[in-house]
């Protein structure tokens, strides 16, 4: 990013299993500081320490966004599947209304960047039943298949 171009990390408010990547959506981010803070303000998006969810970024744009994916919205067997993390495991979302809500959350996140974005899909961890590689690999492969470049 150049000059005054703003960048930051955005995630689904349901992305509970990004904590091993130091992303905890349960920590409340102040959108005023995140969007308006200067480059020397540790609360600003520039520091890439605090993330914003679809609630904090709706209606606002960044020049550059890093969208960090989680296992709540997965591409598998040629369709998008929706999950909610409850207790110690992912559970299938059954209600159509909640499925649509999650899909729209990711739509908001994917439309926040004016100039460009990076989509981060974690590798997963075979030793963590909540972050198995298969929760992420098919989404990652789908993005590559539709032409999103790997960097």
Model-derived features with residue positions:
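C-terminal accessory regions
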Residues: 47-151
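Conserved helicase/translocase motor-coupling segment
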Residues: 1-81, 110
């Amino acid at each position: 990013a150049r000059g005054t171009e703003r960048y930051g990390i955005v995630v689904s408010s349901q992305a509970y299993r990004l904590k091993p990547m130091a992303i905890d959506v349960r920590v409340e981010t102040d959108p005023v500081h995140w969007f308006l803070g200067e480059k020397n303000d540790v609360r600003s998006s520039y520091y890439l320490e605090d993330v914003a969810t679809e609630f904090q970024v709706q209606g606002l744009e960044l020049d550059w966004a890093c969208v960090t994916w989680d296992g709540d919205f997965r591409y598998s067997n040629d369709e998008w599947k929706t999950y909610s993390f409850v207790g110690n495991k992912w559970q299938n979302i059954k209600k159509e209304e909640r499925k649509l809500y999650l899909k729209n959350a990711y739509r908001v996140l994917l439309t926040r960047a004016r100039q460009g974005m990076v989509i981060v899909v974690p590798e997963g961890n075979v030793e963590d039943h909540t972050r198995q590689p298969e929760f992420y690999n098919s989404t990652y492969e789908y993005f590559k298949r539709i032409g999103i470049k790997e960097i």
